[in-house]
């Protein structure tokens, strides 16, 4: 047995499923998950000593690559002064100033510890601000594991085939209305059914938890218009897309202004951080200035703030997003060319530093129903054969892939060459 296999066997006796987040268990592809010893740049190194070109990037945060020296040094320096104070720090103020500078729609920001905390808190704030209970989300979109959001969810819930989680009371779920991504008619129908009851729409501007589904040109502006028409707030969940699709997020890339924005992943540079923010009048409703309660013992943790501040300063440097997009375009086109040459039907969606691979005869993949028709069994074989080639992709047909600026053109070429060999075996 490999060391990963031994560790997985031991972990399953101690941790549910042997992992601390379900998708890591390889449930979506079968086999034994890799146990990682270290990472550097574009590469992961497992406990058995094998190196992999990494396109998971810790599920998105590692836009600069692993173990970036600026982030590592910031963490070391901050840790030398203490790990947590439970009191405000100067770095919290600097971090808030940087985030609101980079994302102009955020007049104010509140730091939390995860993307789930960010979305959960933003929805509570929207409900408190509007005095309404119902929310709209989209089928196949994942916004964390808060009860109200585990209704027809994507990500690990979709991988496990459990889009409606047990443990969520029907009385909670009834306030969550689910519409079809990229379908404005379904959203209007929900508003017309409940014209005075919907507090907000929450949406991934690029749906990254049913693989990678970009919005149709009219979709996000249409959501903004519907929210304005019916007096609801628009929450854009940029936990995955923030600072990755563009410096100011997918909202800037697609030209839509939300009332509230949720951030995570990249904002922590690899540390556990989330944030939500937006219009001042909405944020003023948050405790302690307003009645909507939200709190956290470790929110604004000095180590996490230092890591995030260092990361965002690097991400904001000229050329970062141009490089990220060009590398992703090269990979996407190379995979398409390799698949075509092998006679394998394939769709690759990509935007900014995100991409999605779909084994399908369809010409496009634009919503949840398109995604679930794709050939999952072929993806499983593709995943394991690529892993044997030293390429680590997301271990689920329903998860996006992530590029970093640490990937080299040689890494991209090697990945495409590996895919050519694998397609020949499929």
From Swiss-Prot:
Pfam families: Aminotran_3. One of its GO terms (molecular function) is transaminase activity. The gene is hemL. This is Glutamate-1-semialdehyde 2,1-aminomutase. The lineage of its organism: Bacteria, Pseudomonadati, Pseudomonadota, Gammaproteobacteria, Enterobacterales. It comes from Klebsiella pneumoniae subsp. pneumoniae (strain ATCC 700721 / MGH 78578). CDD domains: OAT_like. It is found in: Cytoplasm. Its cofactor is pyridoxal 5'-phosphate. Disulfide bonds: none annotated. The modification N6-(pyridoxal phosphate)lysine is found at residue 265.
């Amino acid at each position: 047995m490999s060391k990963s296999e031994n560790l997985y066997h031991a972990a399953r006796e101690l941790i549910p499923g042997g992992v601390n987040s379900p998708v890591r268990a390889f449930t979506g592809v079968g086999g034994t998950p890799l146990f990682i010893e270290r990472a550097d740049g574009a590469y992961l190194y497992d406990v058995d000593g094998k190196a992999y070109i990494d396109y998971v990037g810790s599920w998105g945060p590692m836009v600069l690559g692993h173990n970036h020296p600026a982030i590592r040094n910031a963490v070391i320096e901050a840790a030398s002064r203490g790990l947590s104070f439970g009191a405000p720090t100067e770095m919290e103020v600097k971090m808030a100033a940087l985030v609101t500078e980079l994302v102009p729609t955020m007049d104010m920001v509140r730091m939390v510890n995860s993307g789930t905390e960010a979305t959960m808190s933003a929805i509570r704030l929207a409900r408190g601000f509007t005095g309404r209970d119902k929310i709209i989300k989209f089928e196949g979109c994942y916004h964390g594991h808060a009860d109200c959001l585990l209704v027809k969810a994507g990500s690990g819930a979709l991988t496990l085939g459990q889009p409606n989680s047990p443990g969520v009371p029907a009385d909670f779920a009834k306030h969550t209305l689910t519409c079809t991504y990229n379908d404005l008619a379904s959203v209007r129908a929900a508003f017309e059914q409940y014209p005075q009851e919907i507090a907000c729409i929450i949406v991934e501007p690029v749906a990254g938890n049913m693989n990678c589904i970009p919005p149709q040109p009219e979709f996000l502006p249409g959501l903004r218009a519907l929210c304005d028409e019916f007096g609801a707030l628009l929450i854009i969940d940029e936990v995955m897309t923030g600072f990755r699709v563009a410096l100011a997020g997918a909202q800037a890339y697609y030209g839509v202004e939300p009332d509230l924005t949720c951030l995570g992943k990249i904002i922590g540079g690899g540390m556990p951080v989330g944030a939500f923010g937006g219009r001042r009048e909405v944020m003023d409703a948050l405790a302690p200035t307003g009645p909507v309660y939200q709190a956290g013992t470790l929110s604004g943790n000095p180590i996490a703030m230092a890591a995030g501040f260092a990361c965002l300063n690097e991400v904001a440097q000229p050329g970062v997003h141009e490089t990220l997009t060009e590398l992703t375009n090269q990979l996407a086109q190379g995979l398409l060319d390799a698949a075509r040459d092998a006679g394998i039907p394939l769709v690759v969606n990509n935007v900014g530093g995100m991409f999605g691979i779909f084994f399908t005869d369809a010409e496009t993949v634009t919503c949840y129903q398109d995604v679930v028709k794709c050939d999952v069994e072929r993806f499983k074989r593709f995943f394991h054969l690529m892993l044997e080639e030293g390429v680590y992709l997301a271990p689920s047909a329903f998860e996006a892939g992530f590029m970093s600026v640490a990937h080299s053109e040689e890494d991209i070429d090697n990945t495409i060459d590996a895919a050519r060999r694998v397609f020949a075996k499929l």
